[in-house]
Amino acid sequence: MTQEEMLSQMEMMLQPLQQVNASQAETIKKLTEQNESLQSRIKELTAQVAWLNRQLFGRKSEKLPIIDPNYPDLFAGMLPENAQQIADAHDEAVEKIVKTKEERRQEKKNRIMMEDLPVLEQVILTPDNLDTNLYKKIGQEVTRIVEHKPGQLYIKEIIREKWGLKDNTATAPKGMSGVLIAPMPLLPIYKGIAGASLLAEILLQKYEYHMPYYRQIKQYSHLGMKGLTESTVDGWFKQTMELLRPLYEVLKAEVMKSDYVQADETTTPVMNKETHKAVKEYLWMVRAVMERLVLFYYDQGSRAGAVIESLANRYNFKGYLQCDGFAGYETAFKTNPDVLLVNCMVHIRRHLEQALDENRPMAEHGLKEIQHLYKIEHICDDAQMSFDERKAKRQELSRPIMEAMKLWMETEGVKYSESSLIGKAITYAYTRWDNMMRYLDDGRLLLDNNLAENEIRPVTLGRKNYLFCGNHEAAQNMAVVCSLLATCRNHDVNPRDYLNDVISQMPYHAKASHEELLQLLPHKWKLTHPESVMTKTT
């Protein structure tokens, strides 16, 4: 076969392949055109679906005018001055949301809770710098909040008027928009219906009056609020704690800045999530005596001395720490020369009282000497002595008694077995006597820790009513509320007025400094709210 014949044969063989390639190229071209057409159609349909969703689910007061996406743009040739109006329309469209099923369910629940409550307060907000010559009222946004006053729940309506340009073709003044509405005030709970006064009442009822949630809900039901659940109230409580926690941290720092504090601890049942049983945990209390500030502190329920030691070290505490005879304090600070322990005479007296039936002469002698020490304190109180004068009087009268008691314990106490009640009482007193003697050297120091124990009592009473904390977080939240309420009591501040005000203010203090938050603690707050300082009756 010649070369020409071979080439001819190869051409004949390639012809079918060339025809296939041409056919495939034509098919690819058609498919590409079809794909582009489909992509264009998909974009068009997607835009229409989005537009229909906005019309169907968007809030009626914020709906844009119905515009056919295929309709020619009549404003395409308008001047750049209309850019602001275009931006306004864009912002209004962006604000529209498609509400989830859960949001719609919550709105229905809120309506049911509020439907029987009267509207007793309306706050009408008008946009700033409103020129009524240029703008006309075109609508309003209404937010309904549940507020509380003793014996009544009611609705507070926040009405924000919406104003638009009278002349739709006019240009808004520089820096203004075509539609004006006052900004929404910050609320304690974002999108929540509970106002500051209701949140304050929930805290007050549980931790001041010791009323658990289920009793509160029954009370609110009698006042016209239907459908309220414990989970809802607990959710409100937790969000309120997030608001108040920065105040608590400032209070903690202020307490530990003092150079004379009293400390005590008490138990609080906390639910164990594994065993589902309440476990006895510990809540600490630290009181700045001169400043009358009270801190409750919870650290995973521990009673170890390391808890108070860690707290003191974190804030570099230096000064007197007055406490009972719990060995954890001695262990925590035995190597810290900056912390001087002062013990409590009341605890010493209690041990002697317990020994009265066993050895009356010894116990009565000790009790009589302690009684003399308290009489000296009463003399100082009646004379309204200064701290320096009190110190001098103690050096004159109290020191001889204290030294004589120490000698008595050294000589007489050794005669009795440490297992006997009188032996235990003398051992308890003697091992703490050097710490107790420190009160002689500073007129500010108290003879006992009674004021600290008084702060613990409301927690004990509450424990008998709400029984337990659900978890460690709940116990920490309890510490926050109890700290603020106890400080209010120490400064005669009306706790309802105080909580109502600070819960209202805290949303505006998200980035506040330590000094700014300090002004919201009860002892500072009362200086600008004298009407909320309660006068004591005799």
Which residues make up each language-model segment?
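Catalytic center-proximal scaffold of phosphoryl-transfer enzymes
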Residues: Q15, A22, P127, K162-G164, ...
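Short, flexible loop/hinge motifs at secondary-structure junctions
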Residues: M1-I193, D234, Q262-A263, L397-S398, ...
